[in-house]
Amino acid sequence: MTTPVRIGVQIQPQHSPEYSHMRDALRRAEDMGVDVAFNWDHFFPLYGDPDGAHYECWTMLGAWAEQTSRIEIGALVTCNSYRNPELLADMARTVDNISDGRLILGIGSGWKEKDYDEYGYDFGTAGSRLDDLAAALPRIRARLGKLNPAPTREIPILIGGQGEKKTLKLVAQHAHIWHGFVDPESYAHKSAVLAEHCAAVGRDPSEIQHSAGVELNGGVSRGEGVKELVAKADELHAAGITLFTVGVNGPDYDLSVAEELCRWRDSIA
């Protein structure tokens, strides 16, 4: 069965002192037909003023679950280091129930050193953080199976990252969705590596939805940028990617590129 194309928007919780701007962006995204609304799990802005306005991820997801009725929601992605695995499972189960089964549990090993230092977490090394994620994922899944009440569905796990030895192995073992930032050439290679990891664990690679972050080329006119973006989406879709996510930044949260992607999605349906 062919997986339908879906469009995501990452409503980045930065540079918007008033939460109402994010609430409005979420409303507009759902109204225009966006399929998934993501935020991210950081404590400070990733670009612009490093000490600018910023909000916490999972508290916001609870509010999103109440505000929306159709769109799926999640973090792109949760940092595994910031919460005990059992607690994260309970948080995910709770937001899943509040939203009537619309949560995607996006997770990764973490990378932003300032977040770790300012909030008192051990940054470790890239390898140790991936090892921690490998240890956490079975605990998360086990706790999801014990909670009362249970999740409303098997909560889809999205794993972000492209490392061939560890990250893609974890995707093969645990994920329903794999997210990366790829061009068509590197995607073909990474997808083949993921298929090898799936074969090693006896899993059909077609069970995993492939997701990519896309963005407008700021070095050309807007019209040309949209054409380039749609052409890239066409190429990535032909290669196997079916979830396309564009990020939007506060305080304006311009959703015009997401709207173009929704039109493209509908044109190929």
Where are each of the predicted segments found?
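Active-site-adjacent structural elements that line small-molecule/cofactor binding pockets in enzymes
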Residues: M1-A269
